[in-house]
């Protein structure tokens, strides 16, 4: 506690210096002037003296109880109370002024810390005061209270003070019981009552003078304490106990709490409700923020990460972006540091235009009749084959050449090391040839050109070389880096040179792979077979795939139950650059998905579910964007767009994907193709039920409907169509779309009549006497009136007569009378043109 002068203490307590010096002298502290300083020991002595100055006051209270009749009983209760004794007598006016006046500003001390303000409190004159330690911040006196210095850290404890005061009350009440009688019976009750009233009036007047201006209303805490000391008696004078004082609610002040700043983890595609739950706010608040940002959203709508980040920052929280690929990177990353690389066989993809002899060339190399098994001689899906030659093994991928199989060609180019571009010597470069060149260059794969069908009389290999050179495929003989080989798939001419070129190119590439460790690869093709389940053709690229391994292919997972090579033989292990068929997946994977072996089946299942959920969210987001784009594209268009709904079932994933893309490309502004469902396997009853509900046509490509589905289709009238060749399927769909088109209305002139003379008729008005100069005039057809080759009226005929007889038709070179309905301004020299409206079918 720092030292303080007498003048500073007098200024803070609003006392005169002389008065304060007298009080200090009465407490044994000798000070002569206002400049004298008070040491901490003297301040402590002053506070102790103030707290010890107490006095005990006994108060007597008499109450009157009524009995039966006119009898009364006077009850006298005495109560003691300890009251702080005044240091000196002061006038009431001064007391009131000291209560109202507010303390002055705090006085600076040596340590530059403000001394807390000192206030006077008259309540201390009435209420008993407990002795408090020096460390308390507030110590009450008769006329003032002194706050502690700032360097002493003290916290006031109200609850302890209340407990002490309650203990004092209990001790006082016990003393009252011992010293004063409980009941006093007297006959002179009236005299006692008048005496009691005088005492009460004197006490009230004293209390009013002492209370001051700031305490006109009674303190609830004082009332409750007084009520607790009163004892109640029944009508017979027996004690009932103390009256219960009502509980006084204390007004508490709650400090304002800062809003908690949370760190929100944001994943891609998070919904509005999920984001609201993570921020512990209502979903409507998020919707409001989005609305202010100009985005109309519902509580179940998905948000992209950027929008969610803006919302979190707007609401004052922090964020962390969730790494969607964390689990995938941890599971699919294979440690190859302990494994050694070995040379592997090249993976060669045969590409080119349709019917240029790709599969026939591969057939000659494999010495097997593959083309005979393909419908129409057209490759419907990728075939993966491993061929052993005298100079080494080669893995071949045969891709379709039809334009519908663009994605399959791109997939083949991505999975390959070398591309054999087959070009027919008689056809030259065709559209799919150019597309194959683009796929190979995009994948960065070297090209070996095979000029096929050189055995034909009209073959012109030099023409092919020139056309390819125009497309930046330069042969080595011209100074380029592309090897050319003239071959004949029918006779086998030049096939050996082609294989030598492929093996030479593979040596230049120095192809290597890891033969050990967990296998990695790519799905070439997949299908659903009856009795075997999902079957996937997989090309192993690294490691060894073994029977019993846990694999993950896209969104599907499973254990390898069986493996077969390209010849159909069951094998146990497949090394790099080996195509195999595997069984045991949970579903049919998409062609082009990566295949990876995972040691933990639980993690494989979890990752597959995560990929499936991500795919579903992406699909929903795409549908929402498509709906919005369709809404804007359809604005201002008249009429409704016709829709051809199709349910597509196929034998393999690649064919279904290719047909789906081809059919969707047929959509126009007037007719739209909608593939409402597609899948692999036979047509089932559920497909027929879906077709009935959606009024769709079922198309099967290399699949048939089972017996139950056939019966249900006959009953419900659902159309089933089967195809083996993609050309026929696309042509029939085009015809069906043409049938849905609304026909064009075309006007055709069938006759012209010249007005030679005009007659007046009371019945029909003006009658034109005409000569038919072209075609024929028919009674029921619409007409136009032309004057100087300008249409002045369009309507119908009211009458057509040949002489006096009605006629339905008047041919060229004959005269007739024509009455035009609702038109009388026909003049000589006008022409009456007769026409008819015919429907013309639209074409796609």
From Swiss-Prot:
Chain residue ranges for the region called G2: 377-381
Domain named tr-type G: residues: 343-510
Source species, domain of life: Bacteria
Species of provenance: Francisella philomiragia subsp. philomiragia (strain ATCC 25017 / CCUG 19701 / FSC 153 / O#319-036)
Biased composition (Polar residues): 120-132
PROSITE patterns: G_TR_2, IF2
Alphabetical list of PANTHER family matching this protein: TR-TYPE G DOMAIN-CONTAINING PROTEIN, TRANSLATION INITIATION FACTOR IF-2-RELATED
Protein name: Translation initiation factor IF-2
């Amino acid at each position: 506690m720092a030292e303080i002068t007498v003048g500073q203490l007098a200024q803070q307590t609003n006392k005169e210096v002389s008065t304060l010096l007298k009080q200090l002298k009465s407490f044994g502290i000798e000070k002569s002037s206002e400049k004298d300083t008070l040491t901490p020991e003297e301040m402590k002595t002053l506070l102790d003296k103030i707290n010890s100055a107490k006095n005990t006051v006994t108060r007597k209270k008499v109450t009157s109880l009524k009995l039966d009749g006119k009898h009364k009983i006077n009850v006298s209760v005495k109560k003691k109370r300890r009251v702080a004794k005044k240091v000196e007598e002061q006038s009431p006016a001064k007391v009131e002024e000291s209560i109202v006046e507010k303390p002055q500003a705090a006085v600076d001390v040596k340590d530059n810390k403000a001394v807390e303000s000192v206030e006077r409190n008259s309540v201390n004159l009435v209420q008993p005061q407990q002795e408090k330690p020096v460390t308390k911040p507030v110590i009450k006196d008769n006329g003032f209270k002194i706050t502690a210095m700032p360097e002493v850290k003290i916290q006031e404890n109200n609850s302890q003070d209340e407990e002490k005061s309650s203990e004092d009350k209990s001790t006082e009440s016990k003393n009252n019981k011992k010293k004063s009688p409980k009941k006093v019976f007297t006959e002179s009750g009236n005299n006692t009552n008048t005496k009691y009233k005088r005492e009460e009036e004197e006490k009230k007047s004293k209390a009013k003078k002492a209370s001051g201006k700031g305490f006109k209303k009674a303190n609830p805490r004082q009332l409750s304490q007084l009520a607790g000391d009163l004892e109640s008696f029944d009508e017979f004078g027996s004690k009932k106990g103390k009256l219960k004082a009502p509980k006084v609610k204390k007004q508490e002040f709650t400090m304002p709490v800062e809003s908690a700043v949370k760190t929100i983890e944001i994943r891609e595609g998070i919904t509005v409700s999920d984001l609201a739950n993570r921020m512990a706010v209502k979903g409507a608040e998020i919707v409001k923020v989005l609305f202010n940002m100009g985005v109309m959203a519902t509580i179940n709508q998905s948000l992209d990460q950027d929008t969610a980040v803006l919302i979190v920052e707007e609401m004052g929280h922090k964020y962390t972006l969730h790494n969607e690929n964390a689990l995938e990177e941890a599971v699919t990353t294979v440690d190859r540091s302990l494994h050694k690389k070995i040379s592997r066989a090249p993976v060669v993809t045969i590409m080119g235009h349709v019917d240029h002899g790709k599969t026939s060339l591969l057939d000659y190399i494999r010495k097997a009749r593959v083309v005979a098994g393909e419908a129409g001689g057209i490759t419907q899906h990728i075939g993966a084959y491993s061929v052993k030659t005298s100079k080494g093994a080669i893995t071949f991928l045969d891709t379709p050449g039809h334009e519908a199989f663009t994605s399959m060609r791109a997939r083949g180019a991505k999975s390959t090391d070398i591309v054999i571009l087959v070009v027919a010597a008689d056809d030259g470069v065709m559209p799919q040839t150019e597309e194959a060149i683009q796929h190979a260059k995009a994948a960065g794969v070297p090209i070996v050109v095979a000029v096929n069908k050189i055995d034909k009389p009209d073959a012109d290999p030099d023409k092919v070389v020139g056309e390819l050179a125009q497309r930046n495929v330069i042969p080595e003989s011209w100074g380029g880096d592309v090897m050319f080989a003239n071959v004949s798939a029918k006779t086998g001419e030049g096939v050996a040179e082609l294989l030598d070129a492929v093996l030479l190119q593979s040596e230049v590439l120095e192809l290597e792979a890891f033969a050990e460790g967990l296998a990695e690869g790519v799905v070439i093709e997949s299908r659903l077979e009856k009795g075997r389940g999902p079957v996937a053709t997989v090309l192993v690229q690294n490691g060894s795939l073994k029977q019993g391994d846990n694999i993950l292919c896209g969104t599907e997972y499973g254990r390898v139950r069986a493996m077969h090579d390209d010849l159909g033989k069951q094998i146990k292990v497949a090394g790099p650059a080996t195509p195999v068929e595997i069984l045991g997946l949970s579903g049919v994977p998409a062609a082009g998905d990566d295949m990876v072996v995972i040691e933990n089946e639980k993690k494989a299942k979890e990752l597959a579910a995560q990929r499936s959920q991500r795919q579903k969210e992406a699909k929903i987001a795409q549908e929402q964007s498509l709906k919005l784009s369709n809404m804007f594209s359809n604005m201002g268009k008249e009429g409704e767009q016709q829709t051809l709904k199709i349910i597509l079932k196929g034998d393999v994933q690649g064919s279904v994907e290719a047909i789906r893309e081809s059919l969707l490309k047929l959509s126009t502004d007037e007719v739209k193709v909608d593939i409402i469902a597609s899948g692999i396997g036979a047509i089932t009853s559920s497909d027929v039920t879906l077709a009935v509900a959606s009024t769709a046509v079922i198309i099967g490509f290399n699949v048939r409907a089972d017996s139950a589905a056939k019966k249900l289709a006959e009953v419900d009238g659902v159309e089933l169509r089967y195809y083996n060749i993609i050309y026929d399927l696309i042509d029939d769909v085009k015809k069906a779309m043409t049938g849905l088109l609304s026909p064009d209305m075309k006007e055709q002139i069938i006759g012209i009549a010249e007005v030679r003379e005009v007659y007046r008729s009371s019945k029909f008005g003006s009658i034109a006497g005409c000569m038919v100069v072209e075609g024929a005039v028919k009674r029921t057809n619409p007409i136009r009136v032309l004057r100087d080759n300008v249409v002045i009226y369009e309507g119908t005929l009211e009458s057509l007569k040949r002489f006096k007889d009605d006629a339905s038709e008047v041919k060229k070179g004959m005269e007739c009378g024509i009455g035009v309905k609702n038109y009388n301004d026909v003049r000589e020299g006008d022409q009456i043109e007769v026409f008819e409206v015919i429907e013309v079918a639209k074409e796609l």
